[in-house]
Amino acid sequence: MKNIKITQIKSAIGRLPKHKKTLIGLGLRYIGHTVIREDTPSIQGMVKKISYILKIQEE
C-alpha cells in the first residue's frame, strides 16, 4: 500500500471534541507535527473529516 504524509497545520484549540479525538487517533499532537500512515480507507476518512487542519502529501 501507499503511504501518506500528514502534517498538522492548525491548532486543535476551539475545535469540536470529535475532531480533537480524530487528531489524536492519527497520532498528531501539535502544529507542525508530521506522521506517515498507510493509505487505508479508515485513514482517508479521518483525514477527510479534519482536512481543514491538515496538509497531506503522498509518498
Curated annotation (Swiss-Prot):
InterPro entries: Ribo_uL30_ferredoxin-like_sf (IPR036919), Ribosomal_uL30_bac-type (IPR005996), Ribosomal_uL30_ferredoxin-like (IPR016082). GO terms for cellular component: cytosolic large ribosomal subunit. It holds the Pfam family Ribosomal_L30. It comes from the Bacteria. GO terms for biological process: translation. Keywords: Ribonucleoprotein, Ribosomal protein. One of its GO terms (molecular function) is structural constituent of ribosome. Part of the 50S ribosomal subunit. Belongs to the universal ribosomal protein uL30 family. This is Large ribosomal subunit protein uL30. It comes from Buchnera aphidicola subsp. Acyrthosiphon pisum (strain APS). The gene is rpmD.
